[in-house]
């Protein structure tokens, strides 16, 4: 998957395909937001992912981040849902959640 060919549908599909691996890190909920979710990305855009863990640990966070960066060969901005500032509540509304 080249950087230029990525779009929201391909990202969501790839996350669904790797759901078994993603669940290994105690992920309860995961979604795509930001430029890719709006299909307004450019070739240097990072991928913005929001996540909720059943068991939130540093290892689960870092291992998920490394997995996602390996999957997409692109920088990932991984945000834990409950850490969002109230001013950024719109992020939850624009997020495209993935069925795990």
PLM feature segments, named:
Residues 1-29, 37-43, 54-100:
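Catalytic core of pol beta-like nucleotidyltransferases
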Residues 32:
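Conserved histidines in hydrophobic membrane contexts and catalytic metal-binding motifs
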Residues 48-51:
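Short beta-strand->loop micro-motif that forms the acidic, two-metal-ion catalytic signature
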């Amino acid at each position: 998957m080249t950087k230029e060919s990525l779009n929201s549908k391909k990202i969501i599909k790839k996350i669904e395909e790797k759901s078994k691996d993603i669940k290994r890190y105690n992920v309860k909920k995961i979604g795509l937001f930001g430029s890719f979710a709006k299909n307004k990305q450019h070739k240097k855009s990072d991928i913005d992912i929001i996540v909720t863990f059943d068991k939130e640990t540093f290892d689960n966070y870092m291992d998920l981040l490394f997995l996602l960066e390996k999957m997409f060969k692109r920088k990932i901005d991984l945000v834990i849902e409950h850490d969002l500032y109230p001013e950024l509540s719109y992020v939850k509304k624009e997020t495209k959640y993935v069925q795990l």
